């Protein structure tokens, strides 16, 4: 066990701290009925989100990265150009995107496509970073070359980890997400803000303690929830 991992185990034990992934998967389970037809947008290669969704229903994955074809949890994998999805109207009971919206260059097109492929009464569940957070601000301000250099290193990921994709952050505030849902004809979204463990503090104990202080502050009061990094959202397509 490394010193850095020891810090996470000491201050963020799994028995007392859920992080951001557990609440997101719970959101999906609470809103997606068993045996649903699920579209995972930005599915990528095999991952925990796809595995979780496959335990709920039949999952079709779509991504601009051909590596989606290597995702063993998908019943179907589709590579597309990132604009219009190659599915008929009302094809799915649920759509899910996990840390995808920050990479979407044209968010209103994305939300309208989600609304189109959802059946009436269907749900869209997503997780994405909040723009008003030091991680998102850094990713937005730094050139992508620096993001490639630093992002995985700061999170303590190995060389085998996938390089981060380019980011746009054009939909990553609560107000913008609410507006996009309305413009696409979706219901008023239910949004939750979370600040999980400081994963970008794995590179050095000094970073860890600094980011932990930030986590303790923004989780101390609802007043600071707009400064938390993780946005969880669920919205439905109105039933006919």
Positions of PLM-derived features:
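Acidic/polar helix N-cap motif
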Residues: 81-84, 88-89, 106
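Short glycine-centered segments of the SAM/dcSAM-binding site in methyltransferase folds
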Residues: 37, 121-123
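A short SAM/SAH-binding and catalytic strip from SAM-dependent methyltransferases
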Residues: 94-106
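Conserved N-terminal segment of class I S-adenosyl-L-methionine
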Residues: 1-84, 94-96, 111, 227-231, ...
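S-adenosyl-L-methionine-dependent methyltransferase catalytic module, highlighting the catalytic core
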Residues: 108-113, 123-236
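Helix-to-beta-strand junctions that scaffold the AdoMet/dcAdoMet cofactor pocket
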Residues: 33, 104-105, 118-120
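Short, solvent-exposed loop/turn segments at secondary-structure junctions
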Residues: 44-47, 65-67, 101, 131-133, ...
